[in-house]
Amino acid sequence: MEDDFLVLNIREYIKMGKAGEDMLRQVFSSFKCEKNLDVESFLTEQSIDFTKKNQSVTYIVISPDKNNIVGYFTITIKPITVNTDEFSNTVRRKIARVSEQNSDNGKYSLSAYLIAQLGKNYDDSIGNTISGDNLLSIALGKVKELQYMASGMVVFLESENKDRLLDFYEKQNGFKRFETKVTKKYKENSHTLVQLLKVI
């Protein structure tokens, strides 16, 4: 199914200068995600700057038939600290190979791939052309390409604390919870995010 979609690194547009960035903004203008406005605003307002500053890289997913953006994802690398007490021995051993353990608390510190954004386009004009499973699978495929070139073994993401989303990541896609954090971006709307990881 992933082969049915075109996945483009937005650097390909950015390297063309202003004309390329204008093209990107035109593509972004058709992306709608009313279920999570932060996902929509990141793409339209921040993804270009973050990519230019090497803070993260955003990939857009295009349907080949209608040439519409059906989704996007953003990847970066971040340090994490993991308590592996609830993990299987196999997962624990794999994490231990690429991390340092704190002798005081037993937690592991490591660098991991972060899928920082994952968003579907809910614009009515394009229809429901990609599933969440397919979009996540495409993002994980891109992480595995990076793994092939630069090593690494762990990918993680942050989810809102909602059963529907957590079931999607845990039951359907094999991620495991390892921490929670309270967002500090908007104090008046602060909320808890659940951090989940997967060994790849």
Go through the PLM ranges and name each one.
Residues 135, 164-165:
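Conserved short alpha-helix immediately C-terminal to the canonical SAM/SAH-binding motif I
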Residues 1-127, 141-156, 167-200:
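Non-catalytic substrate-recognition and accessory regions of acyl/acetyltransferase enzymes
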Residues 138-143, 162:
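Short strand-loop-helix active-site module centered on a catalytic nucleophile
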Residues 127-139:
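Glycine-rich acyl-CoA binding loop
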Residues 159:
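His/Cys-centered metal/cofactor-coordination and adjacent catalytic loops
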